[in-house]
C-alpha cells in the first residue's frame, strides 16, 4: 500500500503527469458530463452511455461515474479507486471495461466529506497535499461504512436501465480499494467476484479483516505488488489458506511490478503486468458473473 514515504519521494522527484498508454485507453476519451440522479445519461463515443450520478447513501449523497453499453443491459461492476480517488485515469479504466460489456460505477469513496473529483491525477495528489487530505477522509472508511455504501450503490444502480439484474455483480479495487471489494462482497449477496489490485490491509488482526470475511460462493482475484509482498510475505499465504479452508475460489499472485502498477497515471505503472492483470480480471468476470 502506498505510504507517505512513497508520496514524498514521488513529489520530490517532480512526478510527471504521464500520458496514458494506448492499450490502457483503448476505449477512447469521452467528455464526463454531469447528470442528475434520474439516470438519464448522454451518449458517449464507442457505443457507451456515461455521466456523473448521485443518490442517497448512509453517509449523505454518494456520487460517482457511471458508464455502460448503450441500448442493452449489462452485468454491474462496482469500482473502488485508489487513495487519489475519482479522476480521469479511473474514468478511462471504467470506459475500457464498459467496452467489454459491463455497466461500471466508479465510486467517489470520499463522498462523506467532498463531492466529485478532488485531484486531476496522481501527480496532483502526490504534489499538492493529497495525503493529508485523504488521510482524514479515509479514516471514516471502515468495513461497516464500505458495506453500507456497497448496499446503497448496488441498490440504486439496480434501478438503472443499463444494468442486468439477472447477472452477478463484480467489484474491483486498487490500493485502499482492495479490501473494499471483499467487504462489499460480504455485504451484497449478488456480488460473485472481487478483484483486488495492489490492495493494502487484506490481512489484519481484527474481526473485519478481509481474509475473515470471504464467501464460499464468490471468486477472488488477489493481485499483489512485489514490494508490498516484500513487506508482508506471509499475508498472501494467510489469505490463500483462509479461502481454501472455506472452499472459496481464490487466485492469489504476486506480480513482477510495484504498488500502483495497474493504474496508468501512477508512477509505478507497468503496462505489461497491467495488461496481464487486466486479462485475469476479464477472465474472472467471464467465469463468475
Predicted stretch roles:
Residues 200-254:
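The feature captures the conserved acid-bearing segment of alpha/beta-hydrolase catalytic domains
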Residues 1-15:
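N-terminal secretory signal peptides
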Residues 249-289:
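C-terminal catalytic histidine-bearing segment of alpha/beta-hydrolase fold enzymes
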Residues 151-210:
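Primarily recognizes the serine-hydrolase "nucleophile elbow" in alpha/beta-hydrolase
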Residues 122-170:
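Gly/Ser-rich "nucleophile elbow"/oxyanion-hole loop immediately N-terminal to the catalytic nucleophile
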Residues 15-30:
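N-terminal export leaders
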Residues 38-69:
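N-terminal cap/lid segment of alpha/beta-hydrolase-fold proteins
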Residues 74-82:
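Short beta-strand element of the alpha/beta-hydrolase
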Amino acid at each position: 500500500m502506498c505510504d507517505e514515504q512513497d508520496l514524498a519521494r514521488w513529489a520530490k522527484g517532480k512526478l510527471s503527469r504521464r500520458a496514458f498508454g494506448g492499450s490502457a485507453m483503448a476505449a477512447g476519451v469521452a467528455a464526463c458530463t454531469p447528470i442528475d440522479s434520474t439516470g438519464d445519461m448522454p451518449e458517449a463515443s464507442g457505443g457507451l452511455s456515461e455521466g456523473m450520478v448521485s443518490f442517497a447513501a448512509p453517509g449523505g449523497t454518494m456520487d460517482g461515474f457511471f458508464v455502460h453499453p448503450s441500448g442493452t443491459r449489462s452485468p454491474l461492476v462496482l469500482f473502488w479507486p485508489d487513495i487519489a480517488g475519482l479522476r480521469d485515469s479511473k474514468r478511462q479504466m471504467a470506459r475500457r471495461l464498459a467496452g467489454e460489456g459491463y455497466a461500471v460505477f466508479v465510486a467517489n469513496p470520499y463522498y462523506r466529506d467532498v463531492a466529485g473529483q478532488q485531484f486531476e491525477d496522481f501527480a496532483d495528489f502526490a504534489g499538492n497535499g493529497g495525503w493529508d487530505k485523504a488521510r482524514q477522509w479515509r479514516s471514516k472508511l471502515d468495513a461497516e461504512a464500505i458495506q453500507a455504501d456497497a448496499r446503497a450503490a448496488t441498490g440504486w444502480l439496480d434501478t438503472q436501465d443499463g444494468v442486468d439484474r439477472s447477472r452477478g455483480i463484480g467489484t474491483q479495487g486498487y490500493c485502499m480499494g482492495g479490501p473494499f471489494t471483499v467487504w462489499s462482497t460480504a455485504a451484497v449477496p449478488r456480488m460473485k467476484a472481487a478483484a483486488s489490485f495492489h490492495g493494502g490491509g487484506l490481512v489484519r488482526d481484527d474481526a473485519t479483516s478481509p481474509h475473515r470475511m470471504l464467501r464460499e460462493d464468490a471468486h477472488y482475484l488477489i493481485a499483489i505488488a512485489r514490494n508490498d509482498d516484500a513487506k508482508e510475505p506471509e499475508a498472501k499465504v494467510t489469505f490463500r489458506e483462509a479461502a481454501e479452508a472455506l472452499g472459496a475460489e481464490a487466485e492469489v499472485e504476486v506480480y513482477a511490478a510495484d504498488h500502483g502498477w495497474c493504474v496508468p497515471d501512477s508512477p509505478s505503472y507497468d503496462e505489461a503486468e497491467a495488461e496481464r492483470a487486466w486479462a485475469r480480471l476479464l477472465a474472472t468476470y467471464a467465469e463468475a458473473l
